[in-house]
């Protein structure tokens, strides 16, 4: 699935040893010549053509035919089959694969839902070449024989997470379970990872704050710098960075400690020599003959005892391939002093350190224990210290905390449990999954649907209010982490019911009327049928659009599939849902300047991208919603029609009408007034989001299609098709079956 795309703020061009003469002839994007031009590529990347499996491919159905136990058996074989081209530390690739899975999932961030294991983006640039992902290219190559064997039945995203799970289990740790369902992407996401274009540059602003939506503190890191902030070995400052970075990745203090302590129970760091002196280019800049691998090491054997990854060197425990309590006991048993690795990186060793850690390649050699600055932070920070000491004194509690945190880390970006596939899905549900109750009643049929639509239209609610409510409910969906949407009817719960964009007072009255329809239908039935409020919200929007089309002379019927259920307030984490609040929604001409870093137009592209829309879909949706008069706050900006409430192509006709002259409005920035060229009379008002469909050449090209005389009916049908798509974005129960 091509998702999680944000308009490119910085273009990074990586050229594979291309001669200068060729590079000079390389085509450039519009933004190269016109830096202010609008980048619509995020929306074009939703086109299915880039998927080599084709438009009819259903990954969920493929995964259901997979013999998961056979895959796990093959993974276990790979774990202990050391390859000469990249030998396994201690004869076991387990710790290496845990790092691969962790770093694949750990890019997730709560503010925009981007990052995470879904999509298998670790395979692509820039993540493939991030310094924090050094040598993970080899981990994936070790897994290629398994991916090759099972092909379309298991995605890279699923395989990497499953391998991390199997690695943990093979080394004596009991995981909580595993869910498949991560569909692979087929090209790099265009994600804003920070303002700098230099790896390890500080992501903080001039005031030392980490701007939203970022989570990693430095460019090219998954979380924080293990040596300390910007390489300074200050455990107190490191604790502050850890807390902020992990919180932005949906982890609380206890989950953070469990993940670090659990993960650092295994394996070792690699810093046999200076990366600057020994390592070649990252995969994205390596020569063609490297075949996608990077960081070629010219020092010593180039691997094994000479391996260089982070520049830090050593292990946290004396038994790096088994789950033990040693990480925590070592943290408190020793007095740790600052030192440097052979590569010159800051790290810590026990005072009067003894050589107790077996060498990763030579069992006759031993080394001192090691800790990162970020490990010492868990001992010096007061809150982290409380948790680490409690875990040390209660091993079973620590094991369960790590199991839960690991499952959350590797599944957080998958969205609701309805997307989960396989026999190892935990029976327990978690609040971070945005749980939904199961329907314990019969679904409504086509006759009931017709009856309910009629009753909704007879409530006295206007078409506009019904459409606004359905849009407000469904458009919270974001395809970046599959959260939000209408299912659950959480629009009636905190925090959504109070969001300014939803016009709370008006929303309350609409929901009250719909709940009355629901109660009247559900009460005293003998046939076992019921209808949920979430189904009624969508059904009300559909009925209103059909009515608006009828007023314009078109008879349409929008397909509807019941099955949504209603969540409770107890099943809704208010703070977690708060990040879904639209501070800008161009589809409703809403923009909160105080809470946005993107422009209104860029915000529109971002929201359309999260709704998995293409350029034509976004365009026709804007045109329809404008004439249906659904702007937030009742704004008339962009309502370019004399028949508001009728579904027609007037928005495009009037936008492209040359009898109108547009000027900047003196009343508000980002707004415009449209005057009749002959009479000078004010005809329309519009926002920058409206006018971009006449200003931008690519958007205008699509707008011209819908403004044409022969496209009136096409517009109505295209709009309703996209409307249906948005209403069903969260219907994973349908998609997986």
Curated annotation (Swiss-Prot):
GO cellular component: cytosol
Cofactor annotation remark: Binds 1 heme b (iron(II)-protoporphyrin IX) group per dimer.
GO terms of biological process kind: cellular response to hydrogen peroxide; hydrogen peroxide catabolic process
Annotated signal sequence range: 1-23
Domain of life, source organism: Bacteria
Catalytic activity as recorded in UniProt: H2O2 + AH2 = A + 2 H2O; 2 H2O2 = O2 + 2 H2O
Post-translational modification: Formation of the three residue Trp-Tyr-Met cross-link is important for the catalase, but not the peroxidase activity of the enzyme.
Record carries keyword rRNA processing: no
Enzyme Commission number: 1.11.1.21
InterPro entries with a match to the protein in the record: Catalase_peroxidase (IPR000763), Haem_peroxidase (IPR002016), Haem_peroxidase_sf (IPR010255), Peroxidases_AS (IPR019794), Peroxidases_heam-ligand_BS (IPR019793)
Co-factor requirement: heme b
Cross-link (Tryptophyl-tyrosyl-methioninium (Trp-Tyr) (with M-249)): 102-223
A GO molecular function held by the record: metal ion binding
Per UniProt, location of the Tryptophyl-tyrosyl-methioninium (Tyr-Met) (with W-102) cross-link in this chain: 223-249
Keywords, sorted A to Z: Heme, Hydrogen peroxide, Iron, Metal-binding, Oxidoreductase, Peroxidase, Signal
UniProt-listed NCBIfam families: cat_per_HPI, PRK15061.1
Assembly with partners or alone: Homodimer or homotetramer.
Function of the protein: Bifunctional enzyme with both catalase and broad-spectrum peroxidase activity.
Record-given protein name: Catalase-peroxidase
Taxonomic source organism: Yersinia pseudotuberculosis serotype O:1b (strain IP 31758)
């Amino acid at each position: 699935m091509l998702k999680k795309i944000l308009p490119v703020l910085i273009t990074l061009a990586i050229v594979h040893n291309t001669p200068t003469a060729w590079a000079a002839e390389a085509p450039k994007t519009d933004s190269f010549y016109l830096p202010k031009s609008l980048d619509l590529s995020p929306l074009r990347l939703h086109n299915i053509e880039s998927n080599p499996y084709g438009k009819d491919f259903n990954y969920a159905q493929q995964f259901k035919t997979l013999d998961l136990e056979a895959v796990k058996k093959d993974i276990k074989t790979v774990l202990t089959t050391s390859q000469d081209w990249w030998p396994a530390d201690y004869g076991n690739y387990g710790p290496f694969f845990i790092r691969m899975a962790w770093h694949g999932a750990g890019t997730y961030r709560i503010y925009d839902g981007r990052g995470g294991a879904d999509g298998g983006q670790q395979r692509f640039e820039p993540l493939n070449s991030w310094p924090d992902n050094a040598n993970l290219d080899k981990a994936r190559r070790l897994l290629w024989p398994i991916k090759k064997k099972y092909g379309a039945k298991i995605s890279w995203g699923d395989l990497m997470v499953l391998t991390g799970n199997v690695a943990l289990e093979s080394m004596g740790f009991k995981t909580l379970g595993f869910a498949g369902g991560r569909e692979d992407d087929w090209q790099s996401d265009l994600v804003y990872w920070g303002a700098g274009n230099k790896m390890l540059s500080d992501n903080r602003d001039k005031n030392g704050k980490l701007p939203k939506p970022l989570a990693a503190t430095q460019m090219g890191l998954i979380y924080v710098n293990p040596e300390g902030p910007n390489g300074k070995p200050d455990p107190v400052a490191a604790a502050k960075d850890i807390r902020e970075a992990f919180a932005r990745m949906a982890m609380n203090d206890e989950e953070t400690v469990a993940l670090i302590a659990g993960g650092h129970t295994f394996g070792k760091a690699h810093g046999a020599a200076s990366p600057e002196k020994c390592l070649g280019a990252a995969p994205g800049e390596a020569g063609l003959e490297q075949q996608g691998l990077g960081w070629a090491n010219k020092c010593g054997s180039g691997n094994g005892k000479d391996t260089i990854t982070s520049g830090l060197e050593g292990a946290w425990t004396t038994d790096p391939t088994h789950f033990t309590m040693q990480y925590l006991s070592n943290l408190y048993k020793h007095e740790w002093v600052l030192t440097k690795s052979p590569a010159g990186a800051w790290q810590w060793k026990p005072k009067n350190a003894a050589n107790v850690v077996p060498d990763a390649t030579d069992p006759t050699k031993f080394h001192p224990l090691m800790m990162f600055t970020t490990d010492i932070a868990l001992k010096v920070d007061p809150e982290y210290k409380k948790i680490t000491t409690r875990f040390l004194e209660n091993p079973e509690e620590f094991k369960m905390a790590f199991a839960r945190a690991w499952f959350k880390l590797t599944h957080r970006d998958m969205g609701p449990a309805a997307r989960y596939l396989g026999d190892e899905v935990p029976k327990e549900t978690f609040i971070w999954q945005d749980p939904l109750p199961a329907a314990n009643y019969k679904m409504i049929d086509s006759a009931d649907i017709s009856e309910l639509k009629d009753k909704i239209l007879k409530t006295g609610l206007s078409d506009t209010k019904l459409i606004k409510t359905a849009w407000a409910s469904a458009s919270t969906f974001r395809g970046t982490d599959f959260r939000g949407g209408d299912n659950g009817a959480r629009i009636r719960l905190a925090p959504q019911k109070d969001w300014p964009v939803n016009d709370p007072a008006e929303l309350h009255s609409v929901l009250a009327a719909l709940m009355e329809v629901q109660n009247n239908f559900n009460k005293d039935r003998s046939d076992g049928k019921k209808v949920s409020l979430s189904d009624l919200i969508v059904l009300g929007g559909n009925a209103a659009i059909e009515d608006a089309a009828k007023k314009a002379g078109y008879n349409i019927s929008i397909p509807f599939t019941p099955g949504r259920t209603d969540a409770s307030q107890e099943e809704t984490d208010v703070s977690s849902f708060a990040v879904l609040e639209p501070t800008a929604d161009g589809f409703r001409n809403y923009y909160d300047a105080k809470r946005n870093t993107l422009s209104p137009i860029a915000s529109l592209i971002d929201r359309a991208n999260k709704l998995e829309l293409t350029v034509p879909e976004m365009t026709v949706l804007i045109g329809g919603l404008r004439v249906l008069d659904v702007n937030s706050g009742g704004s008339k900006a962009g309502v370019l029609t004399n028949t508001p409430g009728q579904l027609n192509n007037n928005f495009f006709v009037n936008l492209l009408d040359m009898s109108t002259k547009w000027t900047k409005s003196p009343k508000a920035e980002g707004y415009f007034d449209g005057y009749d060229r002959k009479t000078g009379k004010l005809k329309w008002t519009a926002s920058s989001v409206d006018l971009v469909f006449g200003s931008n050449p690519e958007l205008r090209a699509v707008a011209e299609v819908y403004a044409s005389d022969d496209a009136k009916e096409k517009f109505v049908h295209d709009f309703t098709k996209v409307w249906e798509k948005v209403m069903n974005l969260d219907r994973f129960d349908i998609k997986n079956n």
